[in-house]
């Protein structure tokens, strides 16, 4: 009997921790120029391009792989905010070796739900799409935030339209098919070549 009561005390403690018990969904993807390890990937909740304290982040490993757990709120935000990669000096590009100059790559928000089965590829091509969104946007993107986009359907639709237009521009300008914009082009190239 006493073991049983001990067990219930234990579970009482667990629920007492509050936040950490909130279930999380793991999302994953790849950082690609060549595959880059040692880069910091974060969910840019306030669109400022800087990893803030409250923003979920992780570091990419071999083959550019990254994954992190998101709370339900963060997961919802992931559909509406960019995923940013800070590639620092000293990160390793599987194709070109050690990175000597820091740079950033960005995956624009897709405006559709993200699930743990999605692979989010962040590359110079996805960054082009994001840069195009910034260029096309009538107001500075920096004025957006996850809360603002979720709360404001007009803002959401306007930004989703910007994404569509940016994709179209990049497709036309660089002669890349739309489905190739967000893929792992290294893996595809390798299968195509070999």
Residue spans for each PLM region:
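Feature for extracytoplasmic/surface-facing segments of secreted or surface-associated proteins
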Residues: 1-194
């Amino acid at each position: 009997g006493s073991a049983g009561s001990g067990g219930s005390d234990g579970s009482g403690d667990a629920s007492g921790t509050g936040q950490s018990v909130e279930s999380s969904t793991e999302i994953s993807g790849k950082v690609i120029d060549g595959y880059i390890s040692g880069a910091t990937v974060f969910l840019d909740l306030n669109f400022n391009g800087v990893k803030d304290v409250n923003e979920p982040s992780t570091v990419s490993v071999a083959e550019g792989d990254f994954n992190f757990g998101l709370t339900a709120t963060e997961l919802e935000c992931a559909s509406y905010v960019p995923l940013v990669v800070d590639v620092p000096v000293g990160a390793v590009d599987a194709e070109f070796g050690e990175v000597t100059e820091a740079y950033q790559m960005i995956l624009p928000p897709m405006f559709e739900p993200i699930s743990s089965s999605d692979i989010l590829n962040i590359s110079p091509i996805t960054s082009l799409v994001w840069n195009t969104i910034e260029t096309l946007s009538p107001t500075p993107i920096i004025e957006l935030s996850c809360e603002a986009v979720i709360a404001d359907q007009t803002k959401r639709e306007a930004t989703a339209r910007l994404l569509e237009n940016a994709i179209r521009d990049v497709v036309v300008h660089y002669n890349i098919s739309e489905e190739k914009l967000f893929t792992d082009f290294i893996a595809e190239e390798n299968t195509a070549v070999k």
